[in-house]
Amino acid sequence: MIVIKYGGNALPDHNTSDPVLEAIADAFLDGEQIVLVHGGGPQIDAALEEKGLGKNKVAGYRVTDEEVFNVVQSVLSGQVLRSIVNYLIGSEVNAVGLSASDGGLIRARKFKPTVDGKSVDIGYVGEVDEINPMILETLMTEGFLPVISPVATDNDGVGFNINADLVAAAVGGALRADSVIFLTDVDGIYRAWPDKSSLISEISIDELKQIAPSFVDGMSPKVKAAISAIDSGAFSVRIANGTDLASVLDALDNQGGTLVSA
């Protein structure tokens, strides 16, 4: 079974085809068990800009007060989640939409980044504290494809937005997935980005951990998520270009991109 992190850069509907979701639907209908975790950065940015919110950032992290969080939650667990689920249902897939806290799936805790050696409170931004995959196992056994938005609550019922890559990693680990596929906007992990000749086709988790500190900017979060997925129980991770249909099809067929093996 596979867990897929889908960026959701464009909201799908059946007036316009979404080749990535069509490929995922085809794989599911061919018998593959799939869990899909989605992001929604562009939609969140657009919604916040419309309201004049979310402009404050600390060390690259958006400061998420209650008003900002309410917009984020509405976009992720409403607009984006429903759009993806509706599209998959229109492709004859038994898709079910969940927030990351539904059915006791994930318990969150507040995430506080370290800035200049000090822990900083940036509001309703969380990380995975606990995970119980029973709801996903039940749904998959009954023939459903779960679609998860990365919004979860803590033990007091307080909601948090969690990085979708880390949600996918936690889900893949808890389910002991054969593969966790991170669909991104580059062809895989590069040793020396932006040198495209430095693309890594395959690497062990041990070697990736050794070179992990050398990664910066956009590559670092994917590397951290890949390590987290395998450390928590997934058998492999593949990072592939979600903007290129051929790359997506290859990834679903256990090829291409960067393979990280346990």
Language model features by range: what are they?
Residues 2-262:
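C-terminal catalytic "cap/lid" subdomain
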